[in-house]
Regions:
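Active-site/ligand-binding surface loops and adjacent short beta/alpha elements
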Residues: 135-137, 145-212
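Short Pro-Gly-centered flexible turn/kink motifs
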Residues: 14, 61-65, 69, 251-267
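Short, Gly/Pro- and small/polar-rich lid/capping loops
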Residues: 1-8
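Acidic/His-leaning functional-site neighborhoods
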Residues: 68, 73, 78-84, 178-249
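Acidic-aromatic substrate-binding/catalytic surfaces of carbohydrate-active enzymes
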Residues: 11-67, 227
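Short, well-ordered beta-strand segments enriched in hydrophobic/aromatic residues
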Residues: 9-14, 113-115, 122-130
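Beta-strand-rich interaction surfaces with strong enrichment in secreted/lumenal proteins
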Residues: 112-114, 248-253
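Extended, loop-rich substrate-binding clefts of extracytoplasmic carbohydrate-active enzymes
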Residues: 66-118
Length: 268
């Protein structure tokens, strides 16, 4: 089910399926900034990567001494979230473990996702709670896909990623599909930048990551969109890993613990 929020500048629509943004538009432009989930290319739009980013080639991970078949990027990509409430400037959603998630990931958890609008920007905050006796172990990442080109009269190669700091030469990475022949996923560990701008010089998406993200990645399946992905950690850093709890960068919550992380993006 779609829930909508708007202010004087933008309109945001969020789907309870996967808690993904279905649409994000400015009121003064006829531009859709978010990818539409066309399954001919990629059926997701901006999934939550939890409790792991990526997965082993055989999709088997060991949790607490037992092997479990897992989905790529975890249990939230196809999950149905529960809508909790709408305020004047926010939407709040919730997801809890269930029988299906427990078969892949044998831990109990609760997650809240809050979308807040400020002018032409949406801030998205994620809170993960451990309300049980057993400790909770997980990784985390985000995978938002933005239309590229934003202007249908332009092409993918008219766009670039501008970095706040010198994470790439000259702080600018020109986009072209050949880049993703060389790097199927373009990954930067420990980026100095907290701000990343997708732009053709006219229209833009400006992403700002808050504290806690340690990796920034770019991905496209040579499609009319680009994913700007902030991650806490990834299993790709440890090829062949089986023991999930030993993965680098995992977060551990004990009873009563809470993990909180957020990012935001503006549309121009």
């Amino acid at each position: 089910m779609i829930h909508q929020l708007e202010n004087d500048e933008v309109i945001l629509a969020v789907d309870t399926k996967a808690c993904e943004i279905a649409s994000f538009q400015r009121k003064d432009k006829e531009i859709e900034y978010m990818w539409n989930g066309d399954p001919a290319y990629w059926s997701n739009r901006n999934p939550i990567l939890f409790p792991h980013v990526s997965s082993p080639a055989d999709k088997i991970l060991n949790f607490k001494g037992e092997d479990h078949k897992v989905n790529n990027h975890g249990v939230c990509r196809k999950a149905e979230f529960r809508f909790l409430e709408k305020g004047s400037d926010y939407l709040l959603f919730e997801f809890e473990d269930n029988e299906e998630t427990y078969a892949q990931y044998p831990y109990h958890f609760r997650m809240e996702v809050r979308y807040t609008l400020v002018a032409n920007q949406v801030r998205i905050e994620y809170r993960i709670f451990n309300e049980r006796e057993e400790r909770l172990v997980f990784g985390f990442g985000l995978h938002p896909a933005f239309n590229c080109p934003l202007n249908p009269k332009r092409s993918f190669s008219d766009y670039r990623i501008e970095f706040e700091e010198e994470d790439v030469e000259g702080k600018v990475l020109p986009l072209n599909y050949e880049l993703f022949d060389r790097y199927p996923t373009y990954v930067i560990h420990d980026p100095k930048s907290r701000m990343f701008k997708l732009t053709d010089g006219e229209n833009a998406v400006i992403m700002e990551t808050e504290e806690g993200f340690h990796i920034f990645a770019l991905w496209t399946p040579k499609a009319p969109f680009i994913c700007l992905e902030p991650w806490v950690n990834t299993l790709d850093d440890e090829p062949g890993i089986r023991e999930f709890e030993s993965a680098k960068g995992n977060i551990i919550l004990h009873k009563g613990g809470e993990f909180r992380i957020a990012y935001r993006f503006s549309i121009i």
